[in-house]
């Protein structure tokens, strides 16, 4: 499809020119750091991990999470409750705690701050 090919080429040009990846990683780290900090202060069983522009929120007191066995012990019912709460607030997160959320190039410092405030349990 020539239209899809043209769109892909233009997308690659924009990504090369603007290089949003460091900003995406900074935002994902900001979310993880905020969630983990608040979790520790409130003694909540929440652990957020990030890599690049991705993050995942786990409901567990096990830290660090090193493998799939650690992750399987997380509270999926609590995550489902969190997912529904965030969906009502207009955030579409992955519906499973075994998937990751992605920061996009359209997210701003303000939208990340709002997410952190809205996400706090």
Each predicted region: which residue ranges?
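Conserved N-terminal phosphate-binding loop of PLP-dependent enzymes in the Aspartate aminotransferase
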Residues: 1-121
């Amino acid at each position: 499809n020539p239209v899809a090919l043209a769109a892909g080429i233009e997308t690659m040009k924009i990504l090369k020119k603007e290089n949003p990846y460091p900003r995406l990683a900074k935002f994902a780290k900001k979310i993880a750091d905020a969630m983990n900090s608040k979790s520790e202060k409130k003694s909540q069983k929440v652990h957020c991990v990030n890599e690049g522009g991705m993050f995942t929120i786990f409901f567990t007191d096990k830290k660090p999470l090193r493998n799939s066995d650690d992750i399987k012990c997380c509270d999926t019912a609590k995550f489902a409750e969190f997912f529904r709460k965030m969906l009502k607030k207009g955030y579409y997160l992955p519906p499973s705690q075994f998937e990751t959320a992605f920061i996009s190039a359209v997210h701003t410092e303000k939208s990340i701050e709002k997410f952190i405030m809205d996400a706090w349990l």
